[in-house]
């Protein structure tokens, strides 16, 4: 796992390390030299090379001055400019035009707001540098807590951050400004990080293998979704769950006609009580609850619509279902902000809202700090929350959180969220712990998009790509670019 520390947590780690006896100037020397080594490597050497370093106040600027000194020791011609003394823009522009590398040491991870004055000018001017642009800890202009950018920000080709990743380097648009991120160990005592970016090995170890004597009912999944004209959603969920390892999937949809449309060769469809309009009716809750204990997981919501009777059925299912539950889409909307049914549950729950569903459920916008938003809802609901969108956050409250870095904008198409719910359901059916089922589900979802290809991607492509994506996860193989 790659630990992630917020700026506040990093400040505490710095103080803890200094209090334990490591002087701040020693930490600064290590940090600056780590930056200098990165610049040297990316320039391809030092002979005849030129570099520009722009420094701000505080530790970030100090790291930049150490990097400049180290580069000079190695024979690089270095031009240093400081924000505190004022940047001679004419001289700086000339230096940038002939530079082989640029070092951004203006602002660190504690930055908030917008760059102005010389800092904003430098952020725009560095595009003239043909060689590497290396940011110290984080590109100047990027909010270290959220990744937000307000106005100008440095576009780095490389970022050397210290001891742990920062949220602003993982969330967009900050991640897009950071380029290739190198984490340099400078001897900071990180304590016990609660946020991390999971890697292949972490996730593979958390996915249970099927026992030699297993049978299909040991890993069964029950899917409840669909309404008139929306039968594709539960079908996507069902087939994704099977591809992710469910031994048998029943797909409950309202009415005989909907059941016929949602059917598939491998998936067993069941017609549930429906209203005259083809929506799930309240008596359906009794049928679902009667069958639920035969299954290892229940996935509820995709395509259900927003009929009041459907919402009543969903609320009862949520409160009374005795098995792990994945609640998505209209299943979340059915709660209408009432978290009581979730808190009443005796079995684990995974919620998978996008930003709009989050508002409906939590009664507030996600805001810029996605990490804090996911953790708040997880604590209030007593559930694992997977907050969808760029930089997916998986949280189970204050205990731990993961940030998924696979996938991309090509997944923003109809039905892909249904596939994600199905993957999580399949992993839960295999016996994965809910937090890890959600984290591995998000990771696999993104990898499936890489297998399927990005341009023109549709939800069905993801399902076809799941076996290869899951196989690469279980075998610890990196996908070829």
What residue spans do the PLM features occupy?
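Polar/charged alpha-helical tracts
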Residues: 90, 94-97, 372, 376
